[in-house]
């Protein structure tokens, strides 16, 4: 049997599952995405910030296959799923049937049960959407995405309509599921703190172009009182045009945000 010495074998570079090269999307004369270059690595969590009209949702829809591009090159995994601000559940179908909607497999109910168990809703398997809370409905939508075993998970402001405590619980759930399943994630959000708390990178989009791409090196589990958090926050707010923000000179927080920390403590205890 032949043997091989791999010590001097060059390492193989695995291409990023998401690659955009000079991508353009325009409506009439307006370029909503303007010559965009972007890579998202396997298992990487990226948050996308930007003012209204900056191109965030158009970019997400393009990656989801819901919109086309006018020019450039786009590479995305075939296995991808999207979760939107509205859960988009079929009201006449039970939770488990919503989870496997469009999925043609013999063990559909078993897969739905497994996915709902992962999001803490095994007991709501046969519940109808009208009986679900807002947080429960979003968890069903998340289970619907996970059951497809996506290599790319797209999140379009999925927590925007939730109360503060439910948002924090959903943040932790997303992180737990991301660590377990390791998809690449793109989160579109207007919430700067949310972006810093969850992402490996935060990209700021302006007029269809990347205004900044910031690596978040803060250790997890993150808190707004961590050294460096407020500096990153001020930089992002400055990029978003928030008056009074000083991206390069903002002081770091001297103490944790007590309200935020208390909410996280309560959420973790339940």
From Swiss-Prot:
Keywords: ATP-binding, Cell inner membrane, Cell membrane, Membrane, Nucleotide-binding, Translocase, Transport. Residues 18-232 form the ABC transporter domain. It is an enzyme of class 7 (translocase). Its EC number is 7.6.2.14. Its main location: membrane. One of its GO terms (cellular component) is plasma membrane. Residues 247-270 are annotated as: Disordered. It catalyses: ATP + H2O + aliphatic sulfonate-[sulfonate-binding protein]Side 1 = ADP + phosphate + aliphatic sulfonateSide 2 + [sulfonate-binding protein]Side 1. Residues 251-261 have a biased composition (Polar residues). One of its GO terms (molecular function) is ATP hydrolysis activity. It is found in: Cell inner membrane. It is a peripheral membrane protein. The keyword Transport applies. ATP binds at residues 50-57. The complex is composed of two ATP-binding proteins (SsuB), two transmembrane proteins (SsuC) and a solute-binding protein (SsuA). Part of the ABC transporter complex SsuABC involved in aliphatic sulfonates import. Responsible for energy coupling to the transport system. Belongs to the ABC transporter superfamily. Aliphatic sulfonates importer (TC 3.A.1.17.2) family. This is Aliphatic sulfonates import ATP-binding protein SsuB 1. It comes from Pseudomonas syringae pv. tomato (strain ATCC BAA-871 / DC3000).
